[in-house]
Swiss-Prot record:
GO terms for cellular component: membrane. Residues 317-344 are annotated as: Disordered. Belongs to the TMEM82 family. Keywords: Membrane, Transmembrane, Transmembrane helix. It is found in: Membrane. Residues 329-344 have a biased composition (Basic and acidic residues). This is Transmembrane protein 82. It is a multi-pass membrane protein. The chain crosses the membrane at residues 29-49, 75-95, 117-137, 139-159, 197-217, 230-246, 257-277, 282-302. Its main location: membrane. Pfam families: TMEM82. The keyword Transmembrane applies.
């Protein structure tokens, strides 16, 4: 330690705000790595699903044709957005998505999984990871070194997931038929276990993120009354948003509806921040809107596949998904038929 301090004494002093910017960039990079790992694992799963369906060979070719340059651009853009996004707005995005996800799962099938959620939660997952790191490292003496270690670990996991994704896209068909590759044989046996694994991992991630989000928001308030003035309109706004979006999703579950939902969510959050927030929060909301739209655009083919998969499961399991009651005209026709039979 004495030798390190001796050499460090010759280095120029770095201002504190520089280290704050470096820490924000490292947090954003970890959040972007988490989103990319989720994306790669879902891509592997959906690619194998398409290979097993003769009618989806075109989608399999589209998934296989995605270039590494787009993946690098995806990682770089998300890292920049997460580093610029303030922890306050990031915490609000995490809480809003958690409430919406719980509502979607409960209304769908009493806890059933929806494959669309794995892709709709991408930006919220990155916000949650960045927000959790900001809260957990608040006041830490070696904050930058800890974040560098987190970047190294997340980068290693991302590298392995990308390597598996490229391997599956190029050689899975050959190796699964020849049965001599350990990776492809493992995926051939347990590729259906990828969504349950991601589901459990996302539960833990959002549980930690929600706790960190509440703590990050509450640290700006000096009294309970001030916190209540913020949380009361926030709760009302989020509840109304979830109810509205849930009805729209049931009536029109399309790609256009996914983008419309993003604009409605960010618009509601913008109005709320203009009422009880700060001017910096408004800028961060536009950054969040850019990230949400980019994640949906980048996962367009996969979102369409997930939507079709959810619809097929809903049609194949009518008992799990309750059908609507018979229309009024049908009931009136049955009543008229009974009355006619009684008169005869």
């Amino acid at each position: 330690m004495g030798l390190i301090s001796y050499f460090a004494s010759f280095l120029p002093d770095v201002p504190w705000h520089f280290w704050g910017s470096v820490d924000s960039l490292l947090q954003g990079l970890v959040g972007a790595c988490a989103v990319s790992v989720l994306y790669n694992l879902m891509k592997v799963h959906l690619y194998i699903v398409c290979l097993n369906d003769p009618d989806k060979q075109k989608e399999a070719a589209q998934l296989r044709a995605q270039s590494p340059i787009m993946d690098f651009l995806h990682l770089s853009l998300l890292s920049l957005l997460f580093s610029l996004l303030g922890p306050r707005v990031g915490a609000l995005v995490v809480l809003e998505f958690s409430l919406r996800a719980v509502s979607m799962v409960l209304s769908a099938n009493k806890g059933a999984q929806s494959s669309q959620l794995f892709l709709l939660c991408q930006f919220s997952l990155g916000c949650g990871v960045s927000c959790s790191l900001d809260y957990l490292h608040e006041g830490a003496p070696h904050r930058t070194w800890n974040l560098l270690l987190a970047v190294g670990l997340s980068g290693l996991i991302l590298w392995q997931s990308r390597r598996m994704c490229r391997h599956v896209g190029i050689l899975y068909q050959l190796h699964s038929g020849e049965r001599y590759c350990g990776v492809c044989l493992s995926l051939l046996a347990c590729w259906r276990d990828i969504p349950p694994f991601l589901w459990r991992a996302l539960k833990v991630a959002f549980w930690v993120s929600d706790l960190a989000a509440v703590a990050v928001i509450n640290r700006d308030f000096l009294s309970t009354s001030e916190a209540m003035r913020f949380w009361t309109p926030l709760t009302i706004c989020y509840t109304l948003l979830v109810i509205y979006m849930q009805e729209e999703q049931h009536q029109n579950p399309s790609e256009q509806m996914a983008y419309q939902t993003v604009f409605v969510r960010m618009g509601g959050l913008l109005i709320l921040m203009m009422t009880v927030g700060r001017w910096a929060d408004i800028l961060h909301i536009f950054i969040s809107l850019t990230g949400e739209l980019w994640c949906l655009l980048h996962a367009g083919v996969m979102l369409r596949l997930c939507r079709e998969q959810d619809f097929a499961e809903r049609m194949s399991n009518p008992r799990k998904y309750p059908v609507s009651r018979a229309p009024k005209s049908t009931r009136e026709g049955r009543t008229l038929q009974r009355e006619t039979s009684l008169e005869e």
